[in-house]
Amino acid sequence: GVIRSSYPCYIQYEYEQPFTCRNIEIVLNGNNYQAHRLKVMASDDGVNYRLVKQLVPARQGWQNTDEHSTHSIPPTTARFFRFYWTPEGSEPGSEDMDAAKWKPNLKIKELRLHREARLNQWEGKVGLVWRVAQATKEEEVGKQDCYSLSQVINLTKQYTGHSNGKTLTATLPKGKWKLLRMGHTATGHTNATAGGGKGLECDKFNPKTVRKQFDNWFAQAFVKTNPEIARRVLKYMHVDSWECGSQNWNKRFAIEFQKRRGYDLMPYLPLLAGIPMESVEQSEKILRDVRTTISELVVDV
C-alpha cells in the first residue's frame, strides 16, 4: 500500500530497544517531491522529541523514478522516530524540480531506516538517476564511517571458472569482512516511438553503438527517399527530450575514467554503492569525477 495525505501528518516508528539510524531510504510508487521534505524527529520515551534533520529534496527532472532516495542523517540512537510532513513551504515546480508542480500531496510506499553509513543521496551522485543533491556532511558520515583503501581487497582475479559455475577462492586476513559483488547490465529502458525498431537503449558511451542506431533509424530517411531531396530537407537532428534514463558504466568506463581523470577508479568501486571511502570530502570528489566522465563520454559520442 501507499501512505497518502494532503494535510499535516507524521509517520512514527517504535523499537523495543534503542536503534541507531544513520540514513533513511525513501521508497515511492511513482514520483513525489513531498516525500523528501520530511522533518525527522527522535525520542527516547515517545513523549519528548528532538530534531534530527529536515530532509531536503534533490533537484530532479521528471524521469526520477528509476531509483530510491537515501538521505543521510547524523547518527541518532532512539526508540522512537517520527517523520513530520506539512504542505507549507513547498516550492513551485520548475525545470529542475518537475515533481513540485503538482498540488502538495504526500505519497510514500516505504521508509527504511538503516544503521550503516551511506553517502547522502548517493543514487544520483553515482549516476543511477539525474539528481543534484547536497553534499554529505561530516556530522552525518564521519571519518570513522569511511572505509580506507587498505580495507578493500579486489578479489576479481580469484573468481575463476565459466560464467555459470564460477568459484571464488581467497584467503583473507583475520577479521570480519563483507563480500561486495558488483557487475553491470542494461537498465531496462527501451526507446520510445520507435516503431519496428523498438528495443533496449543503446550504449551512449560507445560511438559505434550510437552510430549503428543512428544509421538504422534516423539516417534511413536518406535511404528510403530521394537522397538529394533528403539532404536538402534534413539538415539537423534535434533531441528535445532525454527519456532514456541514466547510464553510469560500460566495458570501457574504467579505462576512460583513468585516461581523463588521471587515477584508477577500481579501488574506489564501493563508492558506486554509496559506501563512503577515505572521507566524505574525498568520496564526494571522486563521485563528481564519475559524473564528469559520464558527461564527457556522452558529449564525445
Residue locations for each model-derived region?
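Short secondary-structure boundary/capping segments
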Residues: L55-R59, H68, D98-A99, L128, ...
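Aromatic- and acidic-residue-enriched carbohydrate-binding clefts of CAZyme catalytic domains
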Residues: L180-C202, N250-T293
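Aromatic, loop-rich ligand-recognition surfaces of beta-strand-rich domains
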Residues: G1-Y49, K53, E67-G142, S241
